[in-house]
Amino acid sequence: LQDQVAQDQASGAAGFFKAIADNKDNSESLREDAQTAYEIVSGTYNSEYGKEPSWYAQRVHLGAKNDATSIEEMKNVLPYLPKVNEARTSHNRSVLGISLTDMAVAMIDADYQTGWLDHPDSLYQSENLTTYMQEPVQSWMQEEETWNEMVKEHPEYADVLNSSYNIYAFFANHYNEYLQVGHFLNLMNPELTHFGMGRLDDSAVSWDVNDVLDVSNPLSVEAYTDLFNKYSKDVLKEDQLNTLKANVATANQNLVAAQNAVKSAQN
């Protein structure tokens, strides 16, 4: 049983995405999203919209301990997800769903971060990175104060947050200013409908919106969390292992009791 657990854990995110893609009870759109995510974390993605980055083999260690694609790191990301929507709804922005493709892109891009933060040549349309592991979303939202000051000094910036196009135009035309507030602008983009996040051990957190698949029906954060927790519990076989450990403990107790009984009889 423990060998099977180790084998299932080793497949990491790939096993999770493949299980969803192969489940015919899931919607066609969810299965497509999962299949794309599977190919991305497995290093096999190649389509007219893009292909696996050249650095994949050097940076991604699928399912390995502390890798962003490991079951443990996927679990560590879960508390971050609702924080994104809390930040958005507090600013009258829509709630975002979870795209499995976004999650996959975020995972491999988190893996790219080794010692410093760097936006890799990858499959994202929009990306935030941080080393603040406890409150990554809050670290990006802190740029709001700087943005508000910018708008006071430049009233013409007031319409930047009205559309994705305006945000991109601000990036293209005011790059130095964008570097100071881009994370906040990305999170507040009014046209977003989905996102994903990844975490590399204690090194970096990534937030991504992919550039390869238009996900029309993303999972809610709650639905994704439930889906992952169920898979994780099945993969880790927690119930079976706990039963096994309890049986071993009981057997050991019975053995000790029997040995003590024999000693008492001999005396």
Regions found by a protein language model. Give the residues of each.
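Long, amphipathic alpha-helical segments that form or neighbor coiled-coils/leucine zippers used
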Residues: 35, 39, 44, 213-246
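Extended aliphatic helical segments
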Residues: 5, 20, 41, 60, ...
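A general marker of short, structured functional hotspots
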Residues: 12-13, 34, 41, 76, ...
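Sequence-level detector for tyrosine residue identity
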Residues: 38, 45, 49, 56, ...
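Residue-level detector of solvent-exposed, low-hydrophobicity positions
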Residues: 23-24, 45, 147, 154, ...
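Short, well-ordered surface patches within globular domains
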Residues: 3-126, 135, 184, 189-202
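Long, non-membrane, amphipathic alpha-helices that form coiled-coils
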Residues: 1-10, 230-267
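A well-ordered secondary-structure block
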Residues: 4-7, 13-14, 121-216
